[in-house]
Amino acid sequence: MKQLIQCMGMLMLLFELSSRVSAQITLVKDGKATSRIVLVEKNEVNEQAATLLQDFVKRISQATLPIVADTKARSGDILIGGKQASAGEDGFLLKTTANEQLQISSGGDKGAIYGVVSLLEQYMGVSYFAKEAYTLTPMQTITLPAIHREETPAFRYRQTYSYNNDDPVYKLWFRLEEPKDMFIENMWVHTFNRILPSDRFGKEHPEYYSFINGEHRPGHNSQWCLTNPKVFDAAVRQLDSIFKAHPDMKMISVSQNDGNNTNCSCPACKEVDEYEGSPSGNLIRFLNKLAERFPDKEFSTLAYLYSMQPPKHVKPLSNVNIMLCDIDCKREVPLTDNASGRDFVKALEGWSKISDNIFVWDYGINFDNIVSPFPNFHILQKNIQLFKKNHVTM
């Protein structure tokens, strides 16, 4: 009798599981909406996700799924909202429930939107390429299979420099999360001359700027004398004003001006450079002092050209971000497969040993002719896997 009860229990469990797996949801039948989009929580992201789904379902079928909130969900509805604990930031879970509803829950930030994009791509056959350039198959009936799909982006920030970036749908479709949006306005890379403009400070305080060939040289492409305590004090005053003008923003770039080998070579700076084995040592020491002065802010700096290699001794504090640049590398082969790339890889591996707060600015371009076609799809995955292995977050 006990064995019979166990057997019956197993059969009931298998029946329940099979019914869940086979559950389908029909959104549109014969050109008429049979489902609703239910906002579990009303907020800007969920509403944007719902509108995107409604828009493309209408493009496919000419039917409009109603968007509702503050109502009890029923069988066949799509539920947008709710927290998915196992998904990371911008992650999501698409899950068909036992009562034939599709739940789109989020790990945070834009997770619900990216869940809708995945639903449209993977289960409705929509491909989006550029502004108003997309493909889909018109259907009078849209039926979804049972779904269980969870994703979290491998990188916190994802950015491409593309003419399509001004299209909001393109940015959502390709899950682009612009780090630039996190920074205080106009304080995004090469900021030394914006924080302490040489036109304003250079004449009275040339000692703030790089000592090159026997004299301090203020200028748009000059750097700071980072061992001069007066430079730190002046930078703190400027930054304090900037932070007060942008109280809701926490991230700023304090980074070298564009140009190579323009760093300060005064005796004090030179001594630090030699001890640290790289001019980046002076930068990180300076940034760490700023990070201690403003512990609630995050400071980004460049590891670029002369500062690409990491320091031997000093380590960035947790609120100091390293933006590592591979500008000197060849790009027709993966970074690991050429000498210039291997020099960058050495720098990347060195930084990853002392920081887990690293961005990579990857120049997927041919500088010899920037407007000519430059096939690089075959190298992207290997490079991206290299970045992920070394704690890169963008």
Model-derived regions: residue spans:
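Feature activates predominantly on carbohydrate-active enzymes
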Residues: 34, 42-52, 56, 85-285, ...
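Glycoside hydrolase catalytic-domain groove-lining segments
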Residues: 311-317, 324-366, 383
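Bacterial Sec-dependent N-terminal signal peptides
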Residues: 1-26
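Extracellular/periplasmic catalytic domains that process cell-envelope and extracellular macromolecules
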Residues: 30-31, 72, 95-98, 246-247, ...
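Short, well-ordered secondary-structure micro-motifs within conserved domains or adaptor modules
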Residues: 66-90
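Substrate-binding cleft of secreted/luminal carbohydrate-active enzymes
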Residues: 369, 375-394
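Substrate-binding cleft/loops of secretory-pathway carbohydrate-active enzymes
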Residues: 300-331, 371-379
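Surface-exposed patches in mature extracellular/periplasmic domains of secreted proteins
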Residues: 62-70, 131-132, 251
